[in-house]
Amino acid sequence: MEIFDYDNILLLPRKCRVESRSECDASVELGGRSFRIPAVPANMKTVVDESICTWLAQNGYFYVMHRFDLDNVQFVREMQGKGCFASISLGVKKPDYDTVDRFVAEGLCPEYITIDIAHGHADSVKNMIGYLKEKLPRSFVIAGNVGTPEAVIDLENWGADATKVGIGPGKVCITKLKTGFGTGGWQLSALKWCARVATKPIIADGGIRSHGDIAKSVRFGATMVMIGSLFAGHEESPGQTVEENGQRFKEYYGSASDFNKGEYKHVEGKRILEPVKGLLANTLIEMEQDVQSSISYSGGKKLMDIRKVNYVILGGDNAGEHLLM
């Protein structure tokens, strides 16, 4: 098995078939809807809030609302009342089951539900998937997070409509340091490994440091890429604004950090300051254009044409050109 990550892989270009990158279609389908780009902001308190999710939905982007200090039922009611799709996160505790029961009682059904726990290959996730499929069968269920083919196979067999791959590769995640487990440092290999057995969409979660990493994720099997740090630190971001030496920053912390949990127990995340990047809309436009450029370099016109290219591994035991077989 080849071990590599985003920073030591490059994709090999093929003959360009377009006059301009604007001819390339960066859109992707997930759960019966088409979205402008294969990227989604991480469902974290310092990345998304109600207003950002509304804007994303109204402008053709996928979103997943976080599950912290939030009335999910009210959120779904308000989003659907605005004519937007509703995409929420749930855990696997009793309050999460109670939330599902409230949806049923009120005749509400979120279009997307992400079961969002740090170690998603678990009986607790199996049970929640089963409950959702029984009570809210029209919801598109994303389950995670996982990092092995066995986990992907199990989640799909349990009824998940998509799986989220990535354990601890994120910029503010310290799972690998705290536990010794995870996909940090080899997230792209883990994605490739998991995608080989997947029959349903994979969302690659974590480890993205640049827009080119989106194309690399698609090449190795991702349908959608969840990103935290690149989407944090915008003017609209919900994180607290901090000024140091005349420069403005936004706080950004992991979902399992003591800042998010409000207590120093079972901490697997940290807090950092992200320089304020400007407006989120501008970043999304740039991201879409960069993905379009990636498609043009792949010799194609559609997003999934990126999966046809060869690649090279830079340095290490696996270095060299790897042809698509």
UniProtKB/Swiss-Prot annotation:
SMART domains: IMPDH. One of its GO terms (cellular component) is GMP reductase complex. It is an enzyme of class 1 (oxidoreductase). It catalyses: IMP + NH4(+) + NADP(+) = GMP + NADPH + 2 H(+). NADP(+) binds at residues 202-225. GO terms for molecular function: GMP reductase activity. One of its GO terms (biological process) is purine nucleotide metabolic process. Its EC number is 1.7.1.7. The active site is at residue 173. CDD domains: IMPDH (cd00381). It comes from the Bacteria. Catalyzes the irreversible NADPH-dependent deamination of GMP to IMP. It functions in the conversion of nucleobase, nucleoside and nucleotide derivatives of G to A nucleotides, and in maintaining the intracellular balance of A and G nucleotides. NCBIfam families: GMP_reduct_2, PRK05458.1. Belongs to the IMPDH/GMPR family. GuaC type 2 subfamily. This is GMP reductase. It comes from Delftia acidovorans (strain DSM 14801 / SPH-1).
